[in-house]
Amino acid sequence: MLSDGTLIVADQRYGLIKVDKTGAAEPFGNFQSIGYKHNPPEIESGPNGVHFSPDKTHIFTADVFSGHIYMTSIEDNKTKIIHSHRYGVNTAIQDSLGNVWFTQSTENNSESRLFEAIGKPISDGIVYRLPLLENGTFFDKPELVVDGMDFANGFYIDEKNNKFYLSETMANRVLSFDLDIEKGELTNRNVLAKIPSPDNMQLNHDGFLWVASPLSNQIYSINILSGE
């Protein structure tokens, strides 16, 4: 949400749309200028996992079908592709050092292959990290951080507590890792909580982790210390 109450929402037709407080919506980010198209079955696009940069000046959007990671300037209303992954990207989030972390849910190049990994567990989910270079661009080859997961989905980078939380959707669990933000490493993998089909997540102001569950049509509030 922008400071004036405007919502920025993923939209297959346009990439992103903005919705004002009256409910009026219009395209945002000028995705068409960089060749964005959604014309199934020939061309499938799947914008997903919309997140602000730490300084709130940009929006990062993953594409779960094409594998593109988009960075949109809020002030200029312009978008560029900062990385094109070989498989779909579920969620992309920038840390305070400028590096972008992202999840590959499965080795999909299409909608049908993505839903194959939702129909049955396939352990090819991965967390990657895309380092920021001194010239302000991103390294062209992402670093593999954690692999072997059953549909890696939404995550949250908790730099204050040096923790990284991740939804492993097809394992019905939320994982917790120790985070070394300087080294870009995740260690001490643990199950924080078991809930059905965990998806996107956000740490609430009360210190509880809010996790969406599409299967149960609920939002779970999880104590990050106890997992309850």
Question: PLM features: what roles do these ranges have?
Answer:
Residues G119-L133:
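Beta-propeller blade signature
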Residues A171-R173, V191-E228:
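Loop/turn-rich, solvent-exposed surfaces of beta-rich toroidal or solenoidal domains
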Residues G15-I17, H68-Y70, G125-Y128, R173-L175, ...:
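A short loop-to-beta-strand structural motif that recurs across blades of beta-propeller domains
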Residues R13, S66, P121-D124, A171, ...:
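A detector of repeated loop/turn-to-beta-strand junctions in beta-rich toroidal repeat architectures
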Residues D11-Q12, V64, S105-E107, T169, ...:
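Short loop/turn segments immediately following the C-termini of beta-strands
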Residues D20-A24, S73-N77, P131-G136, D178-E182, ...:
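Short loop/turn segments that connect beta-strands within beta-propeller blades
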Residues M1-T6, I34-H58, H85-N108, D124-I126, ...:
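Beta-rich, blade/repeat-based domains predominating
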Residues L7-Q32:
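Beta-propeller domains
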